[in-house]
């Protein structure tokens, strides 16, 4: 996995002009996807196993947050400064247009902030099991103060306390627990899975605290942008409700899994979901022009009435001819199927769409 490291700097008066690295992979002629790691995660641990798969379809850009890159002497400042650096990179290198952004957990907050701020345009914003937690400044400060030394010790040792690991395995399963610990930095360090011992407590605190106190608006909407949420159902319904509260008409993709289990344990399926979200045909090009459509209540009501009355039914003389051709096709295909399979009286027939099951049922009766 070869990468070109690109340092980006922050525009504006926010006081942090230190470089942040973005690693690039693949052909620049392909649609660009920006990957954003989760809380206290190294970009290689978070996305190293899926970057080669993504390269077949995308020009891959992987963010390495300040304070979480072993090649840089830096500290994570806050969410808004890091967001400004990302926007600066997209403006300078991609003309302000980004095809897709995937945010793992905390990274989903960055996706939401960039869409909300409207300084650049993202065509497909994807949130990976992001919890989008927000809290009061004092309560969050106290929580961050308590959590920072624990997280710091865990990253420096590369181990989770035995009792905590056992509890995690009992709750979510050993395979998932191991995959998440590896992603988070709690496993043996290798060239592909760097040690996280270099991360300072200041960076941990700043990232944890600023993520929870940086406001994400409700009903975020930008024309030409579609938000996709990989919803891990086992996290609970409250997270689906948050996605629907913060974003107008998000594309909720349901997975009967734990937090980021799809990315951690099933990389091939995860890539397929990313491609499906971006409406790619597997060759790096969109199958159809992307259109954003928001319906009024009257339009939704009419759509429900139309749906109940079979909106696909052709009308008129041309429609009659179309139905005749469709029925002939069904008859030919199902006749071939029946020649291979002798249906018994107690067999169940699965309707796989377009009237195929109904045609099988009619022919089986004869």
Residue ranges and their predicted role:
Residues 356-366:
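Conserved SAM-binding loop of SAM-dependent methyltransferases across substrates and taxa
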Residues 199-242:
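Conserved serine/cysteine hydrolase catalytic core
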Residues 62-99:
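Active-site loop/oxyanion-hole signature of alpha/beta-hydrolase fold enzymes
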Residues 125-155:
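Flexible "cap/lid" loop of the alpha/beta hydrolase fold
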Residues 25-70:
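Conserved HGGG/HGGXW glycine-rich cap/lid loop of the alpha/beta-hydrolase fold
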Residues 257-269:
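Catalytic histidine-centered segment of alpha/beta-hydrolase-like enzymes
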Residues 99-136:
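Conserved hydrolase catalytic core segment
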Residues 328-347:
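Conserved alpha-helix/loop element of class I SAM-dependent methyltransferases that forms part
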């Amino acid at each position: 996995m070869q990468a070109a490291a690109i340092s980006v700097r922050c525009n504006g008066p926010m006081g942090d002009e230190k470089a942040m690295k973005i690693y690039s992979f693949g052909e620049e002629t392909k649609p660009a996807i920006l990957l954003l790691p989760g809380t206290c995660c190294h970009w290689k641990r978070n996305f190293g196993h899926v970057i080669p798969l993504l390269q077949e379809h995308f020009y891959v850009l992987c963010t390495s947050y300040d304070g979480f890159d072993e090649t840089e002497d830096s500290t994570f400042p806050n969410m808004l400064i890091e967001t400004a650096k990302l926007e600066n990179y997209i403006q300078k290198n991609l003309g302000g247009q980004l095809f897709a952004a995937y945010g793992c957990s905390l990274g989903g907050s960055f996706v939401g902030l960039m869409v909300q701020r409207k300084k650049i345009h993202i065509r497909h914003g994807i949130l990976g099991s992001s919890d989008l937690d927000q809290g009061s400044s004092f309560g969050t400060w106290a929580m961050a103060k308590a959590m920072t030394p624990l997280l710091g010790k865990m990253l420096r040792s590369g181990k989770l306390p035995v009792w905590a690991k056992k509890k995690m395995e009992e709750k979510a399963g050993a395979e998932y627990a191991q995959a998440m610990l590896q992603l988070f930095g709690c496993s043996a360090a290798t060239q592909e899975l760097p040690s996280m011992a270099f991360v300072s407590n200041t960076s941990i605190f700043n990232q944890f605290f600023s993520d929870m106190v940086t406001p994400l608006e409700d009903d975020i909407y930008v024309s030409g942008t579609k938000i996709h949420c990989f919803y891990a159902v086992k996290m609970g319904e409250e997270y689906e409700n948050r996605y629907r509260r913060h974003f107008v008409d998000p594309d909720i993709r349901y997975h009967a899994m734990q937090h980021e289990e799809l990315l951690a344990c099933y990389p091939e399926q995860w890539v397929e979901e990313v491609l499906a979200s971006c409406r790619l045909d597997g060759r790096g090009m969109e199958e159809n022009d992307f259109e954003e459509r928001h319906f009024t209540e009257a339009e939704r009501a009419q759509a429900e009435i139309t749906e109940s009355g079979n909106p696909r039914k052709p009308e008129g003389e041309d429609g009659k001819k179309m139905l005749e051709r469709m029925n002939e096709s069904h008859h030919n295909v199902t006749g071939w199927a029946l020649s291979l399979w002798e249906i018994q009286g107690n067999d169940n027939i699965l309707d796989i769409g377009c009237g195929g099951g109904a045609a099988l049922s009619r022919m089986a009766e004869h």
